[in-house]
A protein has these predicted regions:
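Conserved alpha-helical substructure of the radical SAM core
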Residues: 2-113, 117-118
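Radical SAM enzyme [4Fe-4S]-AdoMet core and its adjacent flexible, acidic
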Residues: 1, 123-127, 131, 139-245, ...
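Short glycine-rich, flexible loops that bind phosphorylated cofactors or substrates
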Residues: 80, 131-132
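Short, charged, surface-exposed secondary-structure boundary motifs
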Residues: 110, 132-136
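Short glycine-enriched, charge-decorated loop/helix-capping segments at active-site entrances
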Residues: 46-50, 135-142
Length: 267
């Protein structure tokens, strides 16, 4: 499971370009939620009309006005957006690395709208193994639908990334099985983050969750993807513009655990 050299260079350049005042994740990664309207603060929000798709021109303008080399497209199922195929082509065409997160259910139906380029990762969200995933998705067969979407995407030549989300009740053993299963599918990348935004507090439960994430990321088997998970984790788990708390505790723990190892910092 290799980390793209081009993405490594893009992130390194973003790190050099940012000022000391800016947060690494905010300057390296732009989060788009196409099925959610923009809030008054300028961040994507589902507070008003959760399923109102935003115009592709508006989303592309946000990308062009941002310096982030990585664009993570998530929020409410992005494949419900009618222009998603064209939008990803345009974003990748600007030289950005695109991670399109989906539950995978619509991939088979819409895969023909996308192009398998080296800057696009179709990112499948996992909430545990089959039983746990189906329960959290609220429907039987959700996990198998995700696997079928992955199969179709792989046969079509796309790069595949798994976004494994860790819940408070997730057992580390299940995470280990999930990662092992993902690697057996020959995925191109694995990202691990907390589910539902985690917690901004440093209480015992939140700290335990972050420590679980620390341990799970060690199982990825790639320092590059482990570092990338730390970079995008606070954004993709909904923790934007938050005060230091449990996530910071988890990041510090990971840094300390690798203090004596030679590792690559991508952000």
């Amino acid at each position: 499971m290799r980390f793209p050299l081009r993405l490594t260079v893009d992130l390194a350049l973003a790190r050099l370009a940012r000022t000391w005042r800016e947060n690494a994740a905010s300057t390296s990664v732009l989060l788009l939620a196409p099925m959610e309207p923009a809030s008054p603060s300028g961040l994507d929000s589902s507070a008003l009309h959760p399923m109102a798709p935003r115009a592709g021109t508006e989303l592309l303008a946000r990308v062009r006005n941002a310096s982030a080399p990585v664009v993570w497209i998530g929020g409410s199922e992005p494949l419900l957006h009618p222009e998603m195929g064209q939008l990803t082509r345009c974003i990748a065409g600007t030289g950005r690395d695109v991670f399109l997160e989906t539950d995978g259910a619509l991939l088979r139906r819409r895969i023909h709208e996308f192009r398998p380029v080296s800057r696009l990762f179709l990112t499948i969200q996992w909430n545990g193994l089959e039983r746990s995933h189906d329960v959290r998705a609220g429907r039987a067969g959700a996990f198998q639908a995700a696997l079928e979407g992955m199969r179709v995407a792989r046969l079509s030549g796309f790069l595949i990334c798994v976004h494994a989300r860790v819940h408070a009740e997730t057992a580390l053993g299940e995470m280990a099985e999930s990662i092992h299963f993902a690697r057996s599918l020959d995925v191109d990348g694995i990202v691990i983050s907390s589910a539902n935004g985690g917690s901004n507090s440093a209480n015992a439960e939140a700290t335990d969750l972050q420590q679980k994430i620390v341990e799970a990321r060690k199982l990825i088997g790639s320092k590059w993807w482990e570092s990338f998970s730390r970079l995008v984790g606070p954004l993709v788990s909904g923790q934007r513009n938050t005060t230091p708390g449990a996530e910071a505790v988890g990041v510090r723990a990971e840094r300390e655990s690798h203090a004596n190892e030679e590792s690559v910092r991508v952000a």
